Amino acid sequence: MEEAPAIGAVPVTDTPAVAARTHAENTAFLVIAAVSLCHLINDVMQSLLAAIYPMLKRDYGLDFWQIGLLTMTFQGTASLLQPMIGLYADKRPMPYSLPVGMGSTFVGLMVLAFASDYLLLVAGAALIGIGSAIFHPEASRVARLASGGRYGLAQSLFQVGGNFGSALGPLLAAFIVVPRGQASVAWFSVIAFIGMAILWQVGSWYARYQARATQRPKATRTVTVARHKIVIALVVLAILTFSKNVYMASISSFYTFYVIDRFGVSVQVSQVMLFVFLGSAAAGTILGGPVGDRIGAKAVIWVSILGAVPFTLALPYASLEWTIVLSAVIGLVMASAFPAIVVLAQELVPGRVGMVAGIFFGLAFGTAGIAAALLGVVADAKDIAYVYWLCSFLPLLGLLTILLPNLKRGEAAA
């Protein structure tokens, strides 16, 4: 595989000399493409769980709180383990943990395919969560190492693989799993093996990179942000991640039920509508990172979270046609925030790439999982439409973006 410049394994400074070495041609796009493709594969398998919720609800007689518990098990497991794995890998990099994570997701998928009761469904969801916890921090680190200094672009390309994977899941469920039944989930084992093979090669590149990195002199970033401002900024970024992911969880877990209940569409049509939302989110992810490289992460966060407010407020009152349009706009706008959030957090805490990625990916999974469970309880107590009215106010938390520092290239935290 193509080899990346020495970026991201340790804190570095963006001096003019370094900037001169980090032109686009030095960005290891082959490596970034590989981890992005595997992110797609990983998240296709993950999204199949949520995509077959209507089928599982029908076949197992589940309540909404049980649907929410499946999401909480998957995302809660991932959220608890990711920061710990990221912190450990900052000290002891684990290049070959990537195919292991994919293997755990594969096993979880097989358990889901042949589960005969609800407890086995929960076990399958937990194994998928463990796979995500192993995959995301190290894969995010590899994308940064291969970025050639274009951190926002690399983070977007990495994350968009996951977004496209999440978008493909409902379509695959609609046209393969729903017509053929739960056992057909096992067919996707083929792409899991492909992913494991690719990640083994990525792990080999990563190991060679780490071997060279130990021989280089370490550089440090210039201290320009006070520590108390770092704490405030990280708390704000966590709150913004919470607001974004709770709203996104309301869509990914319950959108199909919402459109079926309100507009009387079929399960397959509801899956296609979910694909429209998730596909738009993938497009937003592509835009967020490169735009952040040009205009700054803070500006992207302003637009992506607070800018979604008019559309989320309008969604509960929209017709079927406008629901499709509004959900697409919401997905496009809100999804552009996360690459910028991760990059800004990594700039604030230099030298802790894996830990920061683990915390924010873990926070994203955890808040979404807890939200899915709680929103399921609300949906049982009230109705699905009430859930979307309640969640429509969450993007107003984007006003907290005003508290974030204005970092320029070459600046970092203490």
Tell me the role of every PLM-derived stretch.
Residues 124-161:
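Cytoplasmic helix-loop-helix junction between adjacent transmembrane helices
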Residues 81-93, 284-296, 379-380:
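Helix-to-loop junctions at the C-terminal end of transmembrane segments
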Residues 49-50, 232-283:
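Extracytoplasmic gate region of multi-pass secondary transporters
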Residues 80-119:
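Conserved MFS/SLC helix-loop-helix module at the cytosolic interface between two early adjacent transmembrane helices
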Residues 292-341:
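C-terminal transmembrane helical hairpin of 12-TM major facilitator-type secondary transporters
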Residues 61, 93, 114-119, 148, ...:
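Helix-breaking motifs and short loop linkers at transmembrane-helix boundaries and internal kinks
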Residues 158-207:
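Helix-loop-helix hairpin linking two adjacent transmembrane segments in secondary transporters
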Residues 47, 75-83, 166-167, 278-286, ...:
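Residue-level signature of mid-helix packing/kink "hotspots" within the transmembrane helices
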